[in-house]
């Protein structure tokens, strides 16, 4: 999808990419996370889970079915080059990368998987520098939080909040957008506390 998106982009375009689904931590093979984080975050990439991906490493899926944050960043970097400095690139991620990806007794769904996708490391794996964030990222929660759905609506809180705000988000500043999203999140507050984040630049 992102490859097709890039092919249709031109200078000055406004590009909006929205991922709503489950996320999972997977082994960081190129070492870029160690330059960004310390502790447990330094060994794992965040990934999006397509419908045909497996939850654990196996002959049918050695990680190639997952969409790691490194791969996402490379595609976004290519789109940024196509649209240039006058274009706008906005990425919304309605997922988290931990949790149980199930509905509990209170019908509250978490959009993450608590099992890490562990890929056997090869010795001497080179380190790579993280790609600079040249786009605006709207995240459903902070890295240590869980992302949940709006109870009774079967839709992620971030997706619902962005739908509520509509096209007005395009011209909002980062701080205003964060505040407006947080206000909507509070309307649907539940036992799972999550704080929306806006990082990077358009």
Model-predicted regions and their roles:
Residues 1-20, 24-106, 172-180:
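Caspase-like (clan CD) cysteine peptidase catalytic core
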Residues 20, 51-55, 141-143, 147-148, ...:
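Cell-envelope and extracellular/periplasmic
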Residues 36, 110-112, 155-160:
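Short, low-complexity, polar/charged sequence segments that are solvent-exposed and flexible
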Residues 43, 131-133, 157:
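Short, solvent-exposed loop/turn segments at the edges of secondary structure
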Residues 63-70, 136, 144-160:
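A short beta-strand-to-alpha-helix junction
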Residues 89, 95-152:
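Extracellular S/T/G-rich loop segment that most often corresponds to the catalytic His/Ser-adjacent loop
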Residues 129, 142, 161, 165-202:
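Caspase-like cysteine protease fold
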């Amino acid at each position: 999808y992102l490859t097709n998106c890039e092919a249709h982009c031109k200078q000055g375009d406004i590009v909006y990419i929205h991922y709503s689904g489950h996320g999972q931590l997977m082994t960081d093979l190129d070492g870029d996370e160690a330059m960004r984080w310390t502790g447990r975050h330094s060994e794992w990439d965040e990934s999006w889970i397509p419908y045909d991906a497996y939850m654990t490493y196996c002959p049918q899926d050695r990680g190639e079915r997952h969409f790691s944050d490194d791969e996402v960043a490379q595609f976004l970097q290519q789109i940024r080059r196509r649209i240039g400095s006058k274009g706008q690139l906005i990425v919304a991620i309605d997922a988290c990368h931990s949790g149980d990806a199930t509905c509990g007794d209170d019908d509250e769904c978490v959009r993450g998987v608590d099992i890490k996708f562990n890929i056997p490391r090869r010795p001497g794996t080179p380190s790579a520098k993280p790609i600079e964030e040249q786009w605006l990222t709207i995240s459903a929660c902070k890295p240590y939080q869980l992302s949940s759905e709006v109870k009774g609506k079967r839709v992620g809180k971030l997706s619902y909040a962005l739908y509520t705000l509509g096209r007005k988000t395009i011209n909002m500043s980062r701080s205003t957008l964060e505040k407006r999203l947080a206000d909507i999140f509070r309307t649907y507050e539940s036992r799972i506390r999550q704080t929306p984040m806006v990082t990077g630049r358009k």
